[in-house]
Amino acid sequence: SPFLSKFNPLVKEQRSGADLFYFDRGDKIGDAADVFANEVRLLIDQHGNSNNRLAVDKIMLHGLRSLEALNFIVVDGEEVTEKSRSIKGADEIKAMRCASYACEKAIFEMEQVTRSEVCNANLSENDIWSVLHAENIKRGGEWIETRLLTSGPRTNPWFQECGPRIVQNNEIVAFDTDLVGSYGICVDISRTWWIGDQSPRPDMIYAMRHAHEHIMRNMELLKPGVHMSELTHNAHKLDEIYQVGKYSCLMHGVGLCDEWPLISYEDKFVEGAYDYHIEAGMVLCVEALVSPEKGDFSIKLEDQVLVTEDGFENLTKYPFDEALMGN
């Protein structure tokens, strides 16, 4: 609704959405699309010297056909928007710092509940995950895009959603926030905890240290001027036992959500797909999923990292689990 932005001096014009949904346009959706397309035409005539090239990132089919009927040449706008969002301005970086701080406070509350209640043998994965939701909303956040919190053997393979399973004493709990937080900024970080009164197994400690080394070594590669392919080819290598279950990428951009670019592992590298250089102001999430093949656990770590003029700054301050680090 236009009134939601009238208070904002940065917004010069307010317009309602095109609203090309069948459920509220019915069999006259084509007419509604024509009205929208004509509004776009008038806007382009006013500001664009009758330029008929139009970049659109997402569009309903009726809208596309109506624009083309007015002789617009519609091209893909997703590349334009992704690249324009990839370099953050000073205000965006401030907002991301605030969002990161709020997210980590929410994680802290989730960890406190987890560590205090698991011993009572009545805390489910859903119970734990609900704390992050509530604490995110409490701090001005918006929503969480996934349900990536699992415990014990459900951490391997990764990408199982949280459910009603009761977390047991002396088990791993791993999660990926994937949340849209304060100021509409995405905070996408991961941690793995050991919950229990005994020590984790040696193979778990080794995997945790290996995952920690993986993200720390890889973020050290980040600085302006580095070609994206260099990040792939110079990355820290996971042990062979973790190759099958490793994450889908080494790093990915982040801003309003997960964004361009994606830095792949060597076995997923596509020549020419990301023929660009890292620039100051980019923010990338550096990933590690250390998941032993046919194992009964996974370690998931992820930090959100800002590329600075002379290197990088890790925006993520949340500590790593002391027991799993072997301390």
Regions found by a protein language model. Give the residues of each.
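Active-site neighborhoods and metal-handling regions in enzymes and metal-associated proteins
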Residues: 1-327
